[in-house]
């Protein structure tokens, strides 16, 4: 299962992703976190 959450900053994407991860065995991958890690 692939799910993509899109929205403006503060829209609740992270909150929704956390709830989805609790109910389904899928990983939560934050592209924002990946980007920040890559530029450091």
From Swiss-Prot:
List, in alphabetical order, the Gene Ontology terms for molecular function in this entry: adenylate kinase activity; ATP binding
- Asked whether the UniProt record includes Signal among its keywords, one would answer no
Q: Give the span(s) annotated as NMP.
A: 30-40
**Presence of the UniProt keyword Chloroplast in the record:** no
Name the EC number(s): 2.7.4.3
The terms describing its cellular component in GO are: cytoplasm
Q: What is this protein called in UniProt?
A: Adenylate kinase
| Organism field | Staphylococcus carnosus
Q: What is the lineage of its organism?
A: Bacteria, Bacillati, Bacillota, Bacilli, Bacillales
